[in-house]
Structures are given as structure tokens and as C-alpha cells.
Amino acid sequence: MNAMLETPELPAVFDGVKLAAVAAVLYVIVRCLNLKSPTAPPDLYFQDSGLSRFLLKSCPLLTKEYIPPLIWGKSGHIQTALYGKMGRVRSPHPYGHRKFITMSDGATSTFDLFEPLAEHCVGDDITMVICPGIANHSEKQYIRTFVDYAQKNGYRCAVLNHLGALPNIELTSPRMFTYGCTWEFGAMVNYIKKTYPLTQLVVVGFSLGGNIVCKYLGETQANQEKVLCCVSVCQGYSALRAQETFMQWDQCRRFYNFLMADNMKKIILSHRQALFGDHVKKPQSLEDTDLSRLYTATSLMQIDDNVMRKFHGYNSLKEYYEEESCMRYLHRIYVPLMLVNAADDPLVHESLLTIPKSLSEKRENVMFVLPLHGGHLGFFEGSVLFPEPLTWMDKLVVEYANAICQWERNKLQCSDTEQVEADLE
């Protein structure tokens, strides 16, 4: 009799369990997708100056909300994963010419050159010299999307193909790209300056490319000649400080580290004969045992220690990271410099962001832009689910470059006016 009385209550119990399960799933989804995170304009760090005030007036994206796709755009992991797997949506195929430069050590550097598709807003000849991210090149979708947009805004674009990154270009010396080697980028810039003597340069670097371009500009004052400005997107600033965070499981950085290391191993091993062959004159510190260690490496640090640092004769990983990071060169950059990172970038630990923040507090030419969302080189925009082909990052870089070009044009006009007035007196 008691059992019969209790039976009708069982469905209510099961309904409660189902409700709790649904609530738990929804909670996990909300947490994982970061749906409660607000949309807001990027945080800006800069000194009050004529340049910064002009940029705030001329670059609406600096003060407007960055609105990522509603469902998944507030997750830095999904933004990063989509960039890594998909690159961009409906990416165009800009037409360019591949250039080859023989380096002093016999290496063959390549870059792709794309002519502008419209007149620039100030009517000048401007070339963007672009350095992609780790193991990337001009054929990557995010680079193609950015180049196409820059061309349509009147920019000539030169895109470095990292040494060894293109699958159809063989290495011609026992060396490939490294974290901070600026030789190939410098050769591309010199080619542009020589071929287009009237052009002015806008320097752009993505991720690892951001480290390379900032290091290049800071290495010598001569490297900043004809440079209007520099933009660095999603770099980590100091490999030495980043290496410890890259081995942590927080924000899945150890997993990302493994994936990138696996990709680097594939690239290095695809050039096995050029780098490790018996006929190759290898660096003295590079031994056959290093190849066996490469097979078992599970992190970028292990690859850097066993192989990459030895291309340039560094005695230790610490020395390699100290010398190859741009952090010690940033204070030597005198042209306008915009540093962009996303607060939810799972690859760049928040402790590394103190570097650009501190720099922007000391230098009037530096602006640090930190949106809440965007992941690592994602910055997708869109209404609900599907992203737009063009990203917030693409628009911001071109908008900033346009503003700097206009700033320089205004300064030139003011100078000309003052000269005329002086002549009249």
C-alpha cells in the first residue's frame, strides 16, 4: 500500500534530475563560451599627446565596442581554434609575384609582392611590409584576407615567407626561420626601398612576426628610415618569460604548446636532408643526436633548445631567448608603434602584457590596444553564429595606418605653410 502511494512521486524525482543535468550543461556552456562577458571598447594605454589625440579622433575602432559573434565569439579558445583551423571565412586570393633573394650564407629567402588596387587616401606611395606568424607565409588565409583589404585601401604589400615554411620551396642552406632572426625580413625591406625609392613603409607583424619586426626596427636607427609606423598583433614580447607559462596547463597552454611543437617538427623533418644530411655543413653545435631528440620533443622549448638555437650558435636556451626577443629593443623604436593583444588570448599569459603596458606609459609614440576578446589572431566579427570574412584586426591595422599617413601629411603641410610664411617675411 505504501509502495503504491510513493510511485506517483518517482517521475517528479526524475524530472528534478533531468532539470539539474540540463542546468549543469547550460552552466558549463555559459562558462566555456564566456557568454556572460560584456562587449566593450578595447582598453587603451597611451600618453596624452597630439598624436594620441589625433589617433583617437581618426580611428573609430579604438573607441567603439568590438562585438564578436554572439554564440562563440567571447571564447578565446574558439576564436584561436577557428583561426588555426579555418584561418578566415571566404578568404580572397590576391594576385602577386614571388621574389627570391639569395642570402650571404646561401639561404634562399622568398617574399610575395602585391600591388595596390586603388589610390591611397593621401595619394602617396605606401608599402606594407608584413611578417606572418610562426611557420606562416603569404598563402595562409588570414594573410590573404589582410593583404586583399590593404590592397583595396591603396597599399602595396610585401609578405615575407618564413624560411622553410613554404612546402614547395626547398632550403638551400642548413638554416630555417627562428624566433627572432631578422635577416630575411631585412632583405625584403631593403629590396622594397631599392626598387621603390619614393615609397614609405608601414611595418606589420603578426604573432612571432610581431617580435621579428619590432626587433628589426630596434636593432639600428637606420632600419627606421622611411618607416611611417609599426603594428604588432598578438606577440608575447619575451620568450624567456613566456617559456614557463607555456608549460602550464592553465588556459590549455601546454596543449597549444604541444600542437605547435608537432607542427614545427613536421616542417623541420620535411627539410631533413637540407638540415641534417651527411653532405651538409652543419653548425658545429648541431649533432646527429639532436635529430633523435627532435622526434621525441613535445614542446617548442625542447625544439628550440635542441635545434633552433644552434642555427645561430647560441650556447643556451636562455641566451637564445634573451637575444632573440624584441623586449630589449622596444625602447629604441621611435616611429609610431601600435601593440595589439587580446585579453583572452590563451597563448599569451596576462603577465606578459605588463611589457607593452609599461612601454606605453613611458613612450609617447606607443599605444597599447587590449580588447577583451579576440583570442590569438582571431578577432572575428559577426552577429550570432557565422563570422564575417573581414576581421576587427584587419580593419584596425589599416585604419591605424591610414591615420598615421594622414598625420604625416598634415605635419608636412604645416611645415610647408610655415616655410612659405617665413619666406614672405
UniProtKB/Swiss-Prot annotation:
Going by the UniProt annotation, this protein carries glycans at 136
Q: InterPro entries recorded for this chain? A: AB_hydrolase_1 (IPR000073), AB_hydrolase_4_CS (IPR000952), AB_hydrolase_4_sf (IPR050960), AB_hydrolase_fold (IPR029058), ABHD4 (IPR012020)
Query: SUPFAM superfamilies from the entry?
Result: alpha/beta-Hydrolases (SSF53474)
Q: Which reaction does it catalyse?
A: an acetyl ester + H2O = an aliphatic alcohol + acetate + H(+); Hydrolyzes glycerol monoesters of long-chain fatty acids; a triacylglycerol + H2O = a diacylglycerol + a fatty acid + H(+); 2-(5Z,8Z,11Z,14Z-eicosatetraenoyl)-glycerol + H2O = glycerol + (5Z,8Z,11Z,14Z)-eicosatetraenoate + H(+)
- What is the relationship between temperature and activity? Optimum temperature is 45 degrees Celsius with p-nitrophenyl palmitate and 30 degrees Celsius with p-nitrophenyl acetate and p-nitrophenyl butyrate.
What spans does the record annotate as topological domain Cytoplasmic, numbered to this chain? 1-9
**What is the uppermost EC class here?**
hydrolase
Highest taxon above the source species: Eukaryota
Keyword annotations: Cell membrane, Cell projection, Cilium, Flagellum, Glycoprotein, Hydrolase, Lipid degradation, Lipid metabolism, Membrane, Serine esterase, Signal-anchor, Transmembrane, Transmembrane helix
Instruction: Mark the transmembrane ranges.
Output: 10-30
GO MF annotation, one: acetylesterase activity
Principal localization reads: membrane
What activates or inhibits this protein? Acylglycerol lipase activity is activated upon binding to progesterone.
* Activity at various pH: Optimum pH is 8.5 for p-nitrophenyl palmitate and 7.5 for p-nitrophenyl acetate and p-nitrophenyl butyrate.
Endpoints of the signal sequence: none
Which GO biological process entries does UniProt record here? acrosome reaction; acylglycerol catabolic process; medium-chain fatty acid biosynthetic process; medium-chain fatty acid catabolic process; negative regulation of smooth muscle cell migration; response to progesterone; response to wounding; smooth muscle cell migration
Q: Name one GO cellular component term.
A: acrosomal vesicle
Ranges for domain AB hydrolase-1 come to 128-382
Q: Show the active-site residues.
A: 207, 345, 376
* PANTHER family reported in the protein's UniProt record: ABHYDROLASE DOMAIN-CONTAINING PROTEIN, MONOACYLGLYCEROL LIPASE ABHD2
**Record family assignment:** Belongs to the AB hydrolase superfamily. AB hydrolase 4 family.
- Protein purpose: Progesterone-dependent acylglycerol lipase that catalyzes hydrolysis of endocannabinoid arachidonoylglycerol (AG) from cell membrane. Acts as a progesterone receptor: progesterone-binding activates the acylglycerol lipase activity, mediating degradation of 1-arachidonoylglycerol (1AG) and 2-arachidonoylglycerol (2AG) to glycerol and arachidonic acid (AA). Also displays an ester hydrolase activity against acetyl ester, butanoate ester and hexadecanoate ester.
Spell out the protein name for this chain: Monoacylglycerol lipase ABHD2
Q: Which gene encodes it?
A: ABHD2
